[in-house]
Curated annotation (Swiss-Prot):
It holds the Pfam family Myelin_PLP. The modification Phosphothreonine is found at T116, T118. A lipid is attached at T199 (O-palmitoyl threonine). Residues 1-10, 89-151, 269-277 are cytoplasmic. This is the major myelin protein from the central nervous system. It plays an important role in the formation or maintenance of the multilamellar structure of myelin. It comes from Oryctolagus cuniculus (Rabbit). PANTHER family: MYELIN PROTEOLIPID, MYELIN PROTEOLIPID PROTEIN. Residues 37-59, 179-238 are extracellular. It is linked to Defects in PLP1 are the cause of paralytic tremor (pt); a sex-linked mutation in rabbit that affects myelination of the CNS. One of its GO terms (biological process) is axon development. This is Myelin proteolipid protein.
Length: 277
């Protein structure tokens, strides 16, 4: 079998659901982690510049922000590795399912690819044999992991539940900034509200961002409007929105992974193949 024919068969047997989910996962995590990190930094600057002059008032908030930023670093690394592993699992189980139905002959394609990589059996020295042996060991170890789709279904299900909480929490800063922006719109257009401009405020203490004894803790009237007009506020608001969208995209990708893995696992069990290929 030629290399082109082998590649064509591999493309036909590609797990497109896993490919789409992987791309969506990487995009969502990058958006969530990158924008979320910068949005937290912007929030820290806004709080210490406009809402409190005493470092003791927002010291705890800064520690929490820094802790979340370190968590973001770990989240990005974890999802990069786990997404790649889920993609490999998608190729592995989808190939097995299509081999059952006769749509995709993984053994033939695998032989063609192996012959292309190792250069065939003829004329191969000890170095080539050593490399081939190392590759076989790696594939064998990887196959032990990928040969248990039930574990991936369980882990992905638990991860989806956890990420659902992350998605809900990512909506909180969007809600706070949206309320602040709405208050600024009321100040900018007094005809839309019957309240006095001086009584329209954004109170960081009300959301638990600052303790109740923080001073001033809130900004009202024209001072609040001037804050909303700053590029720093606008950028932070939009970064939180982007992080929220990234969390939603990641949640959709995890659901897609879980559905695809569950389907493949169910087919393999029903066809009596078990989880060993």
């Amino acid at each position: 079998m030629g290399l082109l024919e082998c590649c064509a068969r591999c493309l036909v047997g590609a797990p497109f659901a896993s490919l789409v989910a992987t791309g969506l996962c990487f995009f969502g995590v990058a958006l969530f982690c990158g924008c979320g990190h910068e949005a937290l930094t912007g929030t820290e600057k806004l709080i210490e510049t406009y809402f409190s002059k005493n470092y003791q008032d927002y010291e705890y908030l800064i520690n929490v922000i820094h802790a979340f930023q370190y968590v973001i670093y770990g989240t990005a690394s974890f999802f990069f590795l786990y997404g790649a592993l889920l993609l490999a699992e998608g190729f592995y189980t989808t190939g097995a399912v299509r081999q059952i139905f006769g749509d995709y002959k993984t053994t033939i394609c695998g032989k063609g690819l192996s012959a292309t990589v190792t250069g065939g059996q003829k004329g191969r020295g000890s170095r080539g044999q050593h490399q081939a042996h190392s590759l076989e060991r790696v594939c064998h170890c990887l196959g032990k992991w990928l040969g248990h789709p039930d574990k991936f279904v369980g882990i992905t299900y638990a991860l989806t539940v956890v990420w659902l909480l992350v998605f809900a929490c990512s909506a909180v800063p969007v809600y706070i900034y949206f309320n602040t922006w709405t208050t600024c719109q009321s100040i900018a257009f007094p005809s839309k509200t019957s309240a006095s401009i001086g009584t329209l405020c954004a109170d960081a203490r009300m959301y638990g961002v600052l303790p109740w004894n923080a001073f001033p803790g809130k900004v009202c009237g024209s001072n609040l409007l001037s804050i909303c007009k700053t590029a720093e506020f606008q950028m932070t608001f939009h970064l939180f929105i982007a992080a929220f969208v990234g969390a939603a995209a990641t949640l959709v990708s995890l659901l897609t992974f879980m559905i695809a893995a569950t389907y493949n696992f169910a087919v393999l069990k029903l066809m009596g193949r078990g989880t060993k290929f």
